[in-house]
Design a protein with these regions (language model features):
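Perimembrane helix-loop-helix junctions
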Residues: 197-227, 231
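Membrane-interface alpha helices of multi-pass inner-membrane proteins
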Residues: 177-192, 202
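Aromatic- and kink-enriched transmembrane "portal" helix at the membrane-lumen/periplasm boundary
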Residues: 95, 99, 127-161, 165, ...
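Start-transfer (signal-anchor) and selected internal transmembrane alpha helices
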Residues: 1-27
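Structural signal for the C-terminal ends of transmembrane alpha-helices
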Residues: 28, 118-121, 165-171, 204-213, ...
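Membrane-lumen/periplasm interface segments of multi-pass, membrane-embedded glycan/lipid transferases
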Residues: 37-47, 52-90, 227-266
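Transmembrane-helix motifs of polytopic, lipid-linked glycan transferases
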Residues: 100-122, 161-165
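Membrane-interface transmembrane helices that cradle and orient dolichyl/undecaprenyl
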Residues: 159-178
Length: 266
């Protein structure tokens, strides 16, 4: 039996990805096309007002100063990458470009998830399925996590990118990949709380992948290090802010609140 040309296979796979993404855009548009409401509408209007009265570079400088406040522990929580940056806000000037931004970020996160699935399964079919499932999860992100500016999608994007760097580190043994993985995990945790969950999932993944607890800890160490650094900032910010972010050891209460939040998301 004659083998299929690899170039044709890659082209066919690309067409399938585009077809799934096109279907996802139609599926997602009901959820992600609505204008921002509530607190998100207020924050977006505030940002756009500042951008309208300043030059781009003035706003970028103001944005950088606001993010530095997180590293100086002057904010109640450590999420310096939570809000869209000055470049991202350029897409928020019209509802059409705003929708395209949300769709693009969602698609980029789903694509990286599919690459992780491809590496784990060594199957393009499984990777394509993971791509579709990640896109299908976007409505849960939007409804349950206030993703008017793609916060959970961006968190997932950085987390999946850090996982891919771990695979490169595992293959090449080049420490530079470990450094990049740690930085990406730090950004993921500094974007939204789910970044911490993804970092712990990375540990679980590598324990299974290496079939060893010690091997999993060693392989996932960069991501865990990035998570630990973000948590130190977050914990220190909570202590200084005094806004209810203190570390709680009331496990039953933590479990109750977690279940309530998950139920609200669904």
């Amino acid at each position: 039996m004659k083998k299929q040309n690899p170039a044709i296979r890659r082209l066919a796979l690309a067409v399938l990805y585009l077809a799934v993404f096109a279907a996802a855009v139609m599926y997602l548009r009901v959820t992600i096309s609505v204008p921002a409401e509530g607190d998100d509408k207020l924050t977006l209007n505030g940002w756009l007002y500042d951008m309208g009265r300043m030059s781009f570079w003035q706003y970028a400088a103001q944005d950088l100063q606001a993010r530095l406040r997180f590293f100086l522990l002057k904010e109640a929580r450590f999420f310096p990458f939570h809000y869209p940056n000055a470049v991202a806000l350029l897409f928020y000037r019209t509802l059409a470009s705003y929708r395209l931004y949300i769709i693009a970020v969602t698609g980029a996160a789903a694509l990286l998830v599919s690459r992780v699935a491809a590496r784990l399964s060594r199957s393009n079919a499984v990777a394509l399925g993971a791509f579709g499932l990640a896109l299908a999860a976007a409505p849960i992100f939007n409804e349950g996590m206030y993703s008017y500016y793609a916060v959970p999608q961006r968190t997932l994007f950085w987390a999946a990118a850090s996982w891919l760097c771990l695979f490169r580190l595992y293959d090449t043994r080049r420490r530079a990949w470990g450094v990049v993985a740690a930085v990406l995990a730090f950004i993921s945790c500094g974007t939204y709380e789910t970044g911490y969950v993804y970092a712990l999932l990375a540990l679980l993944l590598w324990v299974v992948y290496t079939r060893s607890v010690r091997g999993g800890l060693h392989a996932a160490a960069p991501v865990l290090g990035g998570m630990a650094a973000a948590f130190c900032f977050h914990f220190a910010s909570g202590r200084n802010g005094g806004t209810g972010n203190e570390l709680s050891l009331d496990i039953p209460n933590v479990a109750r609140v977690t279940v309530q939040q998950m139920a609200a998301s669904i």
